[in-house]
Amino acid sequence: MKVAIYPGSFDPITNGHLDIIERASKMCDHLIVSVIHNPNKNPLFSLEERKLLIEECIGKYANVTVDCFSGLLMEYAKGKEATAIIKGLRAISDFEYELQMALMNQRLCPSIETVFLMTSTEYSFLSSSLIKEVAKFGGSIHGMVPANVYKAITNRF
């Protein structure tokens, strides 16, 4: 069985993330959306809240599950017997950072490939940080995030 991991902070998940999930789910037998716990960040939503928000969005994908982790991605991936890491790219600036990470990950675990997926054009401007900033100042994020996330963010701000 081909297992792929789509890691991220997903604080919050956006329609761009869901675009990558939908497309990546067609490329593997099992896709694990892995919510990263980063102790150096101060997230809007807790790890468990982010996991639940994502689970509410992925019900139509029988081969997609959600998990949480902290630590080295490649150690986590080996434990899940993954063969690929999925990374979404919006722009060249994403590629520069993600290429460096992919090369390090390849060095740590040569048997696991990194697969880059370009975000669909209509989502290429979206980022979780931008969503939070717009919402914080009262701007509309309608159509940029799933309905459950829209409700959670508007309740938070």
From Swiss-Prot:
<dbReference type="Pfam" id="PF01467">
    <property type="entry name" value="CTP_transf_like"/>
</dbReference>
<feature type="binding site">
    <location>
        <begin position="88"/>
        <end position="90"/>
    </location>
    <ligand>
        <name>ATP</name>
    </ligand>
</feature>
<comment type="similarity">
    <text>Belongs to the bacterial CoaD family.</text>
</comment>
<feature type="binding site">
    <location>
        <position position="41"/>
    </location>
    <ligand>
        <name>substrate</name>
    </ligand>
</feature>
<feature type="binding site">
    <location>
        <position position="98"/>
    </location>
    <ligand>
        <name>ATP</name>
    </ligand>
</feature>
<dbReference type="GO" id="GO:0005524">
    <property type="term" value="F:ATP binding"/>
</dbReference>
<dbReference type="GO" id="GO:0015937">
    <property type="term" value="P:coenzyme A biosynthetic process"/>
</dbReference>
<keyword id="KW-0460">Magnesium</keyword>
<dbReference type="InterPro" id="IPR014729">
    <property type="entry name" value="Rossmann-like_a/b/a_fold"/>
</dbReference>
<feature type="binding site">
    <location>
        <position position="73"/>
    </location>
    <ligand>
        <name>substrate</name>
    </ligand>
</feature>
<feature type="binding site">
    <location>
        <position position="17"/>
    </location>
    <ligand>
        <name>ATP</name>
    </ligand>
</feature>
<keyword id="KW-0067">ATP-binding</keyword>
<feature type="binding site">
    <location>
        <position position="9"/>
    </location>
    <ligand>
        <name>substrate</name>
    </ligand>
</feature>
<feature type="binding site">
    <location>
        <position position="87"/>
    </location>
    <ligand>
        <name>substrate</name>
    </ligand>
</feature>
<dbReference type="GO" id="GO:0004595">
    <property type="term" value="F:pantetheine-phosphate adenylyltransferase activity"/>
</dbReference>
<comment type="function">
    <text>Reversibly transfers an adenylyl group from ATP to 4'-phosphopantetheine, yielding dephospho-CoA (dPCoA) and pyrophosphate.</text>
</comment>
<keyword id="KW-0548">Nucleotidyltransferase</keyword>
<protein>
    <recommendedName>
        <fullName>Phosphopantetheine adenylyltransferase</fullName>
        <ecNumber>2.7.7.3</ecNumber>
    </recommendedName>
</protein>
<keyword id="KW-0173">Coenzyme A biosynthesis</keyword>
<dbReference type="InterPro" id="IPR004821">
    <property type="entry name" value="Cyt_trans-like"/>
</dbReference>
<feature type="binding site">
    <location>
        <begin position="9"/>
        <end position="10"/>
    </location>
    <ligand>
        <name>ATP</name>
    </ligand>
</feature>
<comment type="pathway">
    <text>Cofactor biosynthesis; coenzyme A biosynthesis; CoA from (R)-pantothenate: step 4/5.</text>
</comment>
<comment type="subunit">
    <text>Homohexamer.</text>
</comment>
<keyword id="KW-0963">Cytoplasm</keyword>
<feature type="binding site">
    <location>
        <begin position="123"/>
        <end position="129"/>
    </location>
    <ligand>
        <name>ATP</name>
    </ligand>
</feature>
<dbReference type="InterPro" id="IPR001980">
    <property type="entry name" value="PPAT"/>
</dbReference>
<keyword id="KW-0547">Nucleotide-binding</keyword>
<feature type="site" description="Transition state stabilizer">
    <location>
        <position position="17"/>
    </location>
</feature>
<dbReference type="GO" id="GO:0005737">
    <property type="term" value="C:cytoplasm"/>
</dbReference>
<keyword id="KW-0808">Transferase</keyword>
